[in-house]
Amino acid sequence: MANIPSAKKRARQAEKRRKHNQSQRSMMRTYIKRVVNAIKAGDKAQAEEAYKVAVPVIDRMATRGLIHKNKAARHKSRLNQHLRNLQG
C-alpha cells in the first residue's frame, strides 16, 4: 500500500477508474449480447434495431481506449455478418 499522500490519491483514482471502465465494458458486452440473442431467435427487425444501438456504443468504447479499435471493428464486422446471413 502507498505511504505518500499523492500515491494514495493515485491509487484511489486508479481504483475508481477501473470500476468505471469495468462497468462500461460490461455495458458494451450487454449490447452485443442483445444483438446475438435477437439473431439466435431469428428476429430480423429486433436484431437490426439492437445492432444500430450497439455500433455507436462499441465505437465509443474504442475511442475512449477501453477496447482496441481492431477489436471494435471485429465485433461490428462479425455482428453485421451474422445479420446478413439472417436475411439471406
Curated annotation (Swiss-Prot):
A Pfam family matched in the record: Ribosomal_S20p
One biological process term in Gene Ontology: translation
Keyword flag DNA repair: no
Comp. bias intervals (Basic residues): 7-22
Gene3D superfamilies linked to this entry: Ribosomal protein S20
Ranges where the record places region Disordered: 1-27
Protein name: Small ribosomal subunit protein bS20
Organism, as annotated: Alkalilimnicola ehrlichii (strain ATCC BAA-1101 / DSM 17681 / MLHE-1)
Originating gene: rpsT
